[in-house]
Amino acid sequence: SLMCAVILGTYFLSGTVYAEESLSEFVLDGINVTALGYEKNNLDTPADTVIYTGEQLKETGAGDVANALKYKGGVYFTNMGPHDQNWITGSSQINLRGIDGGTLVLINGVPASFNNVNHLDMLNLDEVERVEIVKGGGAVLYGSEALGGVVNIITKDQMKNSLRVAAGNKGQRDYAATIGMGKASLALGRNEFGSTGNMTERLGTKKINGTAVPYYIGFGDSKKDHLAFNYKFDDRFKFSYMFNKKKYTTNYNDVNENILQHFMYDDREHYAQIAYNDENGWDAKIYYNQRRIENPDYYVVNPTNVEWEKSDHKQYGLDTKKVWRSDKATGLIGISAKRETYKNDNQKFKTFGDSSSILKDPAHFGTYALNNYSVYGSYDRKLSRATNIIFSAREDLIMSEAGDNNE
C-alpha cells in the first residue's frame, strides 16, 4: 500500500512567539532538516517541530542527550536504575507523546535504534550541534517506525578542545574530553556509578540451597564508555564513527543486602557512516550499525553454574535523495535500502529461582534477516505568501524469511 499525505499550511507573518512559561520550549527559529527531509526555516514548517542546540541542552544540567531531553515537553524517558539501567535490555528509552515503539531516533539522519531501543544516554552533549524533534506522525517520509515522531541528533563537524572531570558520592565519576584537529575531531568519555544497595520492597523468594530466602533488587557498579571520531574530507564528504559501551551489574539481594544472584550486562554498539552532500541538492549516506550484548548471571553459592545469553544485531544500508528548488516549489525524491540481521544464543536455568538448578541445553536462534527497500518523495508548492501545499508519499517493501510485506 502507498502511504501519502497532503498538508495545507498557513503561516503567520509575525516573527515572534511569546509564552509565559518555559520559553526554551518554544524555540521556533532556525533551520530544520528533519521534518520535510530538506532544509527549511522552522517557522515555515507545517509540523510540531522544535530545535534544541547543544548549549540549550547543557543548560538542563545533564551531560548526555537522553537526560537533557527528558526535561522537554512531550518527550518521555524511561529507565530503571540510577545510571540509566533498564532490566534485560540495558538501555534507556525515549518516546514522543507516549507512543511506545513509535519514535524513530536518527544520528545525522541515519537510523540509530535497535528494535526501538537506543543509547542516547551515551551521547555526550559536547558532541551535539543540535537536536531536531518532530512530534506526531512522521511515517510518510520515514516509515511506520516514526508513528510518534522523529528525534534527529546532528553532531558537530568540528569540536573545540575541552576537558571535564567530576566526582560525587555513591561512586559517581565523570571524565570527558573533546579534541579538535582541523578536519578531524575526537571525543572520549567515561561515566561511573557505584552500587546502590536494595532499591525495592520485597519481591518474592529465591530458593538458596533448599531454603526460601526473600529477595530485593539492587544495582552494582556500572560504567559507560564512549568514543566518537569525525573526519571532514571537504565540504561534501564526511566520515563519522561512534562506539558506545555500557557495563553494569544488577543483583538479587537478601534483606541485609548480601548478594544472592548476580547479573552482568556488557552492551557494545558501533555506528559508522559516510555522508555526501553537495550544492546541487544531492544527499547520500552509507552506514553500518552493530550491537552486541552479553548478560551472564549466577547464584553466589554456586558461581561456576552460569546462565548466559548473547545477541548480535546488525544494520547496514544506504539512503540517497535529490532536492530540486525553484522560486515557487521544492521537490524531493529518495530511495533507501536497509538490511538487518539478528541472532541469539543462550543457556538458561531449568528451574527458575533455584540456586541448585541445572542448566538447559544451549539454544540457538537465527541468524534472522530482514531487507527493507523504500521509495519516498514530496512536493512543496507555495500558493501565497502565507500558504503552502505539501504532498508526500512513501512506499516500503519489507522482505524476510517470514514473508514479504508492503507498507
Predicted features, each with a name:
Residues 1-23:
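Cleavable N-terminal targeting peptides that direct proteins into the secretory/outer-membrane pathway or into
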Residues 93-94, 110-135:
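Short acidic/polar hinge/loop motifs at secondary-structure boundaries
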Residues 29-60, 93:
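N-terminal periplasmic "start-of-domain" segments of outer-membrane beta-barrel proteins
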Residues 160, 178-265:
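Periplasmic-side early beta-strands and strand-to-turn transitions of outer-membrane beta-barrels
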Residues 66-110:
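Extracytoplasmic beta-strand/coil segments of soluble accessory domains associated
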Residues 29-30, 155-168, 183-188, 281-282, ...:
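Transmembrane beta-strand segments of Gram-negative outer membrane beta-barrel proteins
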Residues 65-68, 92-95, 106, 118, ...:
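N-terminal periplasmic accessory domains that precede
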Residues 186, 232-246, 266-407:
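Face-selective signature of the C-terminal outer-membrane beta-barrel domain
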